[in-house]
């Protein structure tokens, strides 16, 4: 589907809306799955207020649901300089792509038993950091600044001793979004992961939040109703949450993210399309994988690599027929993606109604089904 885009659709200001602070969910629901669902018919504009637990009632027969199976890494490290000053580092490179360097000048001085890799991350410190500065995060993790980029993004040498995932699990914090105004806690270790998350897909720096609403029992219900499942991988990184700063959104450059689509998933989608069954993307990350690969390759095919696709009104969707998603931040690339799918004015009108009806917004908030 392609919406006829207008000049207003390309203005960043066209994606602004007022959101009362108390509509931003600070905690997950008491139980997983106790979320609301706002169903939007993107052709007629009809809106239905429902429960997410009743999702099966609102899906077309035989739908293929495609979910992101990446798992959130406790990627936020709190440490200090040699002088004692506090620093913070958020690893952006997907964990499976952190490859130890061979011994040589690029790897610096590596002590026996230690590994080193060049990675990308976000750095914050009370005083400016410079190339060559060394930062410590416990006894077995440290970072040396290589190059500082814009908005805190930096290339660094990451030094570690032991198993890297274990070290992050021990020393790291879940990188909750800044609009959640509290420290991460024990509940987030479970509730900020989806039921689709796989240990061998550990490395996202934010949850694919549409998946947070699903429970094992809901998956069983959907399967019993004749719906099918497929998975893709997108390691959620800077591209998903970096702000759009251009007055004309067409000038925005997305930061790339690493994705994987298996032959099994491609075949499941081909069968669904051949049978006339809809493909339902569980979240904008799943949507970005499918559309990113199909756009880059001309068709959907098995793929492991990067995507920097940016969808906004005027984009023609090639794979995704329906979309399950949360409510997104004003002026964000994700709101633009949803607007590309259902029309900017229709989406913003739906958001206004959701605010009036008391829906919870953003990562731990309620969901929409756009069909």
From Swiss-Prot:
Provide the catalytic activity annotation.
7-aminomethyl-7-carbaguanosine(34) in tRNA + S-adenosyl-L-methionine = epoxyqueuosine(34) in tRNA + adenine + L-methionine + 2 H(+)
Q: What is this protein called?
A: S-adenosylmethionine:tRNA ribosyltransferase-isomerase
The UniProt family comment states: Belongs to the QueA family.
EC number(s) recorded for this UniProt protein: 2.4.99.17
For the biological process aspect of GO, one term held by this record is: tRNA wobble guanine modification
What the protein does comes down to: Transfers and isomerizes the ribose moiety from AdoMet to the 7-aminomethyl group of 7-deazaguanine (preQ1-tRNA) to give epoxyqueuosine (oQ-tRNA).
Top-level division of the source organism's lineage: Bacteria
Name the pathway: tRNA modification; tRNA-queuosine biosynthesis
Signal peptide stretch: none
At the top of the EC hierarchy, this enzyme's class is: transferase
UniProt cross-references to NCBIfam families, sorted A to Z? PRK00147.1, queA
Which subcellular locations apply to this protein?
Answer: Cytoplasm
Q: Which GO terms describe its molecular function?
A: S-adenosylmethionine:tRNA ribosyltransferase-isomerase activity
Task: Please name the HAMAP family in this protein's record.
Answer: QueA
Q: Which keywords are on file for this protein?
A: Cytoplasm, Queuosine biosynthesis, S-adenosyl-L-methionine, Transferase
Q: Which gene encodes it?
A: queA
Does the record's keyword annotation contain RNA-binding?
no
- Organism, as annotated: Nitratidesulfovibrio vulgaris (strain DP4)
* Subunit-structure text: Monomer.
GO CC annotation terms, alphabetical? cytoplasm
């Amino acid at each position: 589907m392609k919406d006829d885009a207008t000049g207003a659709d390309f203005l960043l200001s066209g994606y602004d809306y007022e959101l009362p602070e108390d509509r931003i969910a600070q905690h997950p629901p008491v139980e997983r799955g106790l979320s609301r669902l706002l169903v939007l018919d993107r052709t007629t504009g009809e809106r239905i207020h429902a429960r997410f637990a009743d999702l099966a009632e609102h899906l077309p027969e035989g739908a293929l649901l495609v979910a992101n199976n990446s798992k959130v890494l406790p990627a936020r490290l709190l440490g200090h300089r040699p002088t004692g000053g506090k620093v913070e580092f958020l690893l952006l490179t997907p964990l499976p792509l952190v490859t130890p360097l061979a011994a040589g000048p690029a790897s610096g001085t590596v002590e026996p038993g230690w590994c080193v890799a060049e990675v990308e991350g976000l750095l914050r410190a009370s005083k400016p950091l410079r190339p060559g500065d060394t930062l410590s995060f416990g006894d077995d993790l440290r970072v040396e600044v290589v190059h500082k980029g814009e908005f805190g993004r930096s290339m660094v040498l990451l030094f570690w001793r032991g198993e890297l995932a274990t070290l992050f699990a021990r020393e790291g914090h879940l990188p909750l979004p800044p609009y959640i105004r509290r420290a991460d806690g024990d509940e987030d270790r479970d509730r900020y992961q989806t039921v689709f998350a796989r240990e061998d897909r550990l490395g996202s720096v934010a949850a694919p939040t549409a998946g947070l609403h699903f429970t094992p029992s809901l998956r069983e219900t959907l399967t019993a109703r004749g719906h099918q499942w497929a998975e893709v991988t997108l390691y959620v990184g800077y591209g998903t949450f970096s702000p759009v700063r251009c007055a004309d959104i067409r000038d925005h450059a997305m930061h790339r993210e690493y994705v994987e689509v298996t032959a099994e998933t491609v075949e499941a989608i081909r069968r669904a399309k051949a049978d006339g069954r809809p493909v339902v993307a569980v979240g904008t990350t799943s949507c970005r994988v499918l559309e990113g690969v199909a756009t880059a390759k001309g068709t959907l095919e098995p793929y492991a690599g990067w995507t920097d696709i940016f969808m906004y009104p005027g984009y023609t969707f090639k794979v995704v027929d329906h979309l399950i998603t949360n409510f997104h931040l004003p002026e964000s690339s994700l709101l633009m993606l949803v607007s590309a799918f259902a029309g900017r004015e229709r989406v913003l009108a739906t958001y206004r109604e959701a605010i009036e009806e008391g829906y919870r917004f953003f990562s731990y908030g309620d969901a929409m089904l756009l069909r």
